[in-house]
């Protein structure tokens, strides 16, 4: 298992999307640092378990990004807990978390939990609507959220989520500049090696999700692109 603070490249797999055994093998053996299992729509215990069982055939670190309490299952290396900092509904900031701890607090292995301070910035994405996120933010707003994530909440991760489209590099650069201990994760619109390399210049962790379902061959090239950039 690769420790989370060593991650540079991650693939995100959606339990609600089809992936062939051949494609899954290519993803899991690509050299990526981890696989995150997670999605927005129709994430169930059954499809989460099905995908997890297939991933576990390979020696790759696997984390569950929790979006629905009913889909939580033991066995993952880590459990990523999103807090949507720019949500306009308290449930997505702390409400769902309180409910989870109230129900499962006695059995939670706290060492496996990693909090993510999410900043959802693509207003057209399903996750923005789902989490009631205020997405019309300027760079200073994003920088403020990054500072909150590190200095007030002390989250291990601050996640810039553009979900399906590539965000402005200036936003990534400015957020990166104010973070020291908190790792900057970027996700959204990474389709090829050039995209990944550009983002890797500033983000600690590059997430490739939708791109692997659209063009697997190009998505696989992002692993080497990120690793090469981090070695410079």
UniProtKB/Swiss-Prot annotation:
Q: GO annotations under biological process?
A: glycerophospholipid biosynthetic process
Record's catalysed reaction(s): sn-glycerol 1-phosphate + all-trans-heptaprenyl diphosphate = 3-heptaprenyl-sn-glycero-1-phosphate + diphosphate
Enzyme Commission number: 2.5.1.n9
Q: Which cofactors does this protein require?
A: Mg(2+)
Top enzyme class, one word, equals transferase
Oligomeric state and interaction partners are given as: Homodimer.
What is the official name of this protein in its record? Heptaprenylglyceryl phosphate synthase
Gene (UniProt): pcrB
